[in-house]
Amino acid sequence: MKLRWFAFLMVLLAGCSSKKDYQNPPWNPEVPVKRAMQWMPISEKAGKAWGVSPRLITAIIAVESGGNPTLVSKSNAVGLMQLKASTAGREVYRYMGWKGQPSTSELKNPERNISMGTAYLSILEHGVLKGIDDPEVMQYALVVSYVNGAGALLRTFSSDRKEAIEEINGMDKNEFVDHVAKNHPAPQAPRYIWKVQKAMDAM
């Protein structure tokens, strides 16, 4: 009986430990940031064209692909900024007035990938997230929306977009991150914010 109780206790502790590690496991941004920095000239060009910080673009590249332009994920996210052709890619195409969606080969092209990823960030900022006043909160909202969708983020505040933006504007960046950690349906969302910020700090 004691042996069974000890085994149960060890499993319980292991579960608690793994949950804690998942929330904030070690991640060294040095190598992925160094690899992502090689694409900075393209990021600067795209950032200037779309009004997006090149440092944010580079940080997303570091976190998403580690600077590998040919990376394809299990969910078919492609390239440096890990764009899905059927979602972000299609949205950028629609915004530009083009038909269809980008091909895999197009998304593996560093310049095209960064251009479309940056365009998508701009579309989010000046579209569904428009109205967020604090620049730091906006940046965090962009990061979460980029990886998990803007709709999922806004619904954690309200089903009404205007009310959601108003609630966000009542928060500072720390309160926003805390809200995301407690309410976002994707458990990786707060960690993604942390990793992008860590990558930016490493530049």
UniProtKB/Swiss-Prot annotation:
Keywords: Cell outer membrane, Cell wall biogenesis/degradation, Lipoprotein, Lyase, Membrane, Palmitate, Signal. It catalyses: Endolytic cleavage of the (1->4)-beta-glycosidic linkage between N-acetylmuramic acid (MurNAc) and N-acetylglucosamine (GlcNAc) residues in peptidoglycan with concomitant formation of a 1,6-anhydrobond in the MurNAc residue. It is an enzyme of class 4 (lyase). It is a lipid-anchor. It holds the Pfam family SLT. It is found in: Cell outer membrane. GO terms for molecular function: lytic endotransglycosylase activity. Murein-degrading enzyme. May play a role in recycling of muropeptides during cell elongation and/or cell division. Preferentially cleaves at a distance of more than two disaccharide units from the ends of the glycan chain. This is Endo-type membrane-bound lytic murein transglycosylase A. It comes from Enterobacter sp. (strain 638). The gene is emtA.
